[in-house]
Design a protein with these regions (language model features):
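Alpha-helical support elements that line or immediately flank enzyme active sites
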Residues: 19-31, 124-146, 150, 227-235, ...
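A short glycine/serine-rich beta->alpha loop
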Residues: 9-14, 114-126, 219-223, 279-284, ...
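Glycine-rich, mobile lid/loop segments that gate access to catalytic sites or pores
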Residues: 109-225
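Short acidic, glycine/tyrosine-flanked loop/strand segments centered on an H-E-D-like triad
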Residues: 95-120, 311-329
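N-terminal, positively charged regions that mediate nucleic acid binding
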Residues: 1-57
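Internal helix-turn-beta structural module
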Residues: 9, 80, 305-364
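Glycine-rich, N-terminal phosphate-binding loop and its surrounding beta-alpha-beta segment
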Residues: 42-105
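Glycine-rich anion/phosphate-binding loop at the beta-strand->alpha-helix junction
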Residues: 12-13, 19, 203-320
Length: 364
C-alpha cells in the first residue's frame, strides 16, 4: 500500500518520470495555519547539496489543490501536486533489472506492467510530495510546541556529535531547519562531503545513519503492545526508500548493558517535573511517551545506482548480463533523507495525537 496512518493518513501517487507526483493528507484538524514558505524551505532541503545530490534538478513548485482555505486547513483532505519537469528516461532499460533496486520485485508484483523509468513509483522522487504534506503536519505540531529535527549522525565513516551530548534541545532542532546539510559539527560536515565526493568519483555510493529527536511530546501518548510509538513511527520510516534499520534510544546497545546501566532513573527537575537522569529508552516506556525527548536512529543503505559495472539478468531473455547505470543519481541518499524522516515522523505523531485526543486536538 502507498498509504500511511490510521486516522491521519497520507497517500502517495505518481511515478518518477510521470507527469506529476501527488500526496493526499487526510484527517488533519481544521484551523492549522499552513506556511507555504516553510514548505518551500523543506523542499529545498530535500533537493540537497550538489556534492551528494542527484544532477536532476526539479524546481518542486507545488500546488495545494484542496483542504486549505485562506491559509488554514479546512479539516478535509489536503491534496498537493508537484509536476515533474526534469525527467530523462533515456538511461533506463526495461528488461535489465538494477541490483539493489525494486526493479526485480516490481516486475513480479505488477506482472511486468510497472513503470520502470527512474524506479517508477518506488523512486525517492515521490518523497517530494511526502515532504510537502508532512511539512503541514509539522506546522500543526509546531503550533503546540512539538519540534522534530534530524541530523546526519554518520556518513562515510565520519560521525557528528549525537543529540545526547548536549541534550535534544528545541534550539538545536530549529537550527537544523536552516541546514541543507544537517550536521552540527562543521569539521565533521567537511569530512563527510569529502567522503561523498570521493565515492562519486569512484563511481560508488555511501550509506549513512540519521538521528532524529522529537521535543515537546506530552506524557501518555501511544498505546501498549502493537500501538506503541516505536511501532507507529517505524511503520512510516521503513516506507522511506533506502531505510534498512531503526533503533530507539540506546537501541541495540541496550542488549550489551546490565539493568543497572540501562534503566533510566527518575528525578524531579527545578520545576518539580518528573524527568529521567538518562534517556536510554528514547523517551518511550511500554510504547508510551514519558515526557522526555523521543530519540531514534535510522540506517540508510548506500544509493543502489552506481556507475560501476554490475552483473544482472535480462528478464526478456532470462540470460545473465552486465549493466552500467548512467542516470543522474545521488552519491549518498542519506544526505537528503533528514527532512523526509522529519515529515514522516510528523504524520505519525499527528496520527497518535488524533487517536488519543480526537480530531480537534490542534485547535483545542
Amino acid at each position: 500500500m502507498s498509504t500511511l496512518g490510521d486516522m491521519v493518513t497520507l497517500t502517495l501517487a505518481g511515478e518518477s518520470h510521470g507527469p506529476a507526483i501527488t500526496a493526499i493528507l487526510s484527517g488533519l484538524p481544521a484551523g492549522v495555519k499552513v506556511e507555504e514558505a516553510f514548505i518551500e524551505m523543506q523542499l529545498r532541503r530535500r533537493r540537497g547539496i550538489s556534492t551528494a545530490a542527484t544532477a536532476r534538478q526539479e524546481p518542486d513548485d507545488f500546488e495545494i489543490l484542496s483542504g486549505v482555505f485562506n491559509g488554514c486547513t479546512t479539516g478535509t483532505p489536503i491534496t498537493i501536486t508537484i509536476y515533474n519537469e526534469d525527467a530523462d528516461s533515456s538511461d533506463y532499460n526495461a528488461s535489465k533489472v538494477r541490483p539493489g533496486h525494486a526493479d526485480y520485485t516490481a516486475f513480479y508484483k505488477y506482472h511486468g506492467y510497472q513503470d520502470f523509468r527512474g524506479g517508477g513509483h518506488f523512486s525517492g522522487r515521490i518523497s517530494a510530495a511526502l515532504v510537502a504534506a508532512g511539512t503541514i503536519a509539522r506546522d500543526a505540531l509546531r503550533d503546540m510546541g512539538i519540534i522534530i529535527g534530524t541530523h546526519i549522525a554518520e556518513l562515510g565513516g565520519v560521525c557528528d556529535r549525537p543529540f545526547a551530548e548536549g541534550g535534544a534541545s528545541t534550539a538545536d532542532l530549529l537550527k537544523l531547519d536552516g541546514m541543507d546539510f544537517a550536521v552540527f559539527d562543521k569539521e565533521a560536515a567537511k569530512q563527510m562531503k569529502k567522503a561523498v565526493s570521493a565515492a562519486r568519483k569512484a563511481g560508488d555510493s555511501l550509506g549513512g545513519v540519521l538521528e532524529t529527536a522529537i521535543c515537546g511530546l506530552p506524557e501518555g501518548l501511544g498505546e501498549p503492545w502493537f500501538g506503541g510509538i516505536e511501532g507507529e513511527i517505524s511503520r512510516g520510516i521503513f516506507g522511506i526508500p533506502g531505510v534498512k534499520g531503526v533503533e530507539f534510544g540506546a537501541g541495540f546497545a541496550l542488549a550489551r548493558m546490565k539493568g543497572s546501566e540501562a534503566n533510566d532513573e527518575f528525578e524531579l527537575d527545578e520545576h518539580r517535573r518528573v524527568v529521567t537522569k538518562t534517556n536510554n529508552c528514547g523517551g518511550i516506556l511500554g510504547g508510551i511517551s514519558d515526557g522526555m525527548p523521543v530519540i531514534f536512529r535510522t540506517a540508510i543503505k548506500p544509493t543502489p545506482s552506481i556507475s560501476k559495472k554490475q552483473k544482472t539478468v535480462d528478464m526478456s531473455t532470462m540470460e545473465e548480463t552486465e549493466i552500467e547505470i548512467n542516470g543522474r543519481h545521488d552519491a549518498a541518499i542519506a544526505a537528503r533523507a533528514a527532512v523526509i524522516i522529519d515529515s514522516v515522523t510528523a504524520i505519525c505523531v499527528c496520527d497518535l495525537f488524533t487517536k488519543r485526543f480526537g480530531n480537534d486536538w490542534a485547535t483545542e
